[in-house]
Amino acid sequence: MSGIVPEIPGEQAPPDAAHQLKVDVARLLQKPKLNFPGAQPVSFARKHIEEELFKRDYYVCEKSDGLRCLMYVTWENNPDTGPQQVTYLITRNNEFFFIPMVHFPSNDGKPLQDTIVDGELVLTKAEPRSLHFLMFDCLACNKILLTGRPLDKRLGYLNAAISHPLKEYLHKNPEVARDFPFSVRVKDMQFAYNVMNVFASFPHLPHITDGLIFTCRDHPYVSGTDERILKWKKQDENSVDFLMTMKFPIFEDTNGESWTDYDAKPEITLLVWTGRDGSRPYGELYLTDEEWDNLKALEEPLEERVVECIKDDKKRWRYLRFRDDKTNANYITTVEKVIDSIDDPVSEKNLLDAAPKIKELWKERNRRPRDEDRKRVGGDDHDHGAKRARQ
């Protein structure tokens, strides 16, 4: 099930200001390029159970159906009031949106600054709908670069330096909380072997969820595609984002005059992104007459729009929704991995069946360092005792 992509409750920064913000973010993250610095998951394949979940420690959380954003908290000089804290949301298109009426204190009582958090903006399912920003990673906190640290450490900063001070501040200042354009909280993270708890939480979540995200516990934060962030979806919900182009039928009347019939159902070609070579055709979108009528009724531009598609039981690509938060289709290798997940799916039962072994191997991995520490401590004590005996 897919929901409505939420709109960002803020004003987009103009090009000149956005460029400077990109420079500031790149400097903070020590990155040479000004592109979107967020990590992107890969589709969960059957091999990932044995090659990843059995061999490495992973956290798992629900995959929210919303708008992926980075939150950037910094300081800007106001000519009237002097330096003040400002907050931006950064989209996957690397657009910066100024978010008014928010304030983030840090754990030393001072306003937070030079901080970048990874998260998702979601809408609640029930009316009246409200916005929530769900945080799940931290790239930088109060000028401290965290991308090279393991997930455990990054989550520690996210909770101790961002989430907890904010909770206390809003508890003491409820009138400020009412002005926030969205609530802010940390996503619930579970050890991978507790995946059953995450599945059990789905019916109780206030927002739509469409899968799971597994993130490696001892892995650094990687900008771009990260092979150690695994996105799992049910087979019938695995989707691909294509760029669609339309070819309308041409009719010729008895007088030999021809015209394009823009009311008739067109042939719709689905394109994937290849990088330097741009977009190339990958397949066709199947639409029923009713679906075409519904699209026409939107009275919106349709040509060269990014569309999220799923495969039906007849292997046809079907329309799910438009993704206006994206300018490009999925990269060709991403599409191929999603196709692999569709053709050789990992079911919920497969993950639940694997959980006991994931736990067994997790415990074994984490028991080894403690055993080695005990051996070292025992050896040290023995050496110290020998020295005392000789004295």
Swiss-Prot record:
Record's keyword terms, sorted: GTP-binding, mRNA capping, mRNA processing, Nucleotide-binding, Nucleotidyltransferase, Nucleus, Transferase
BP term (GO), one: 7-methylguanosine mRNA capping
Catalytic activity: a 5'-end diphospho-ribonucleoside in mRNA + GTP + H(+) = a 5'-end (5'-triphosphoguanosine)-ribonucleoside in mRNA + diphosphate
GO MF term list: ATP binding; GTP binding; mRNA guanylyltransferase activity; RNA polymerase II C-terminal domain binding
Family: Belongs to the eukaryotic GTase family.
Functional note: Second step of mRNA capping. Transfer of the GMP moiety of GTP to the 5'-end of RNA via an enzyme-GMP covalent reaction intermediate.
Entry protein name: mRNA-capping enzyme subunit alpha
Lineage: Eukaryota, Fungi, Dikarya, Ascomycota, Saccharomycotina
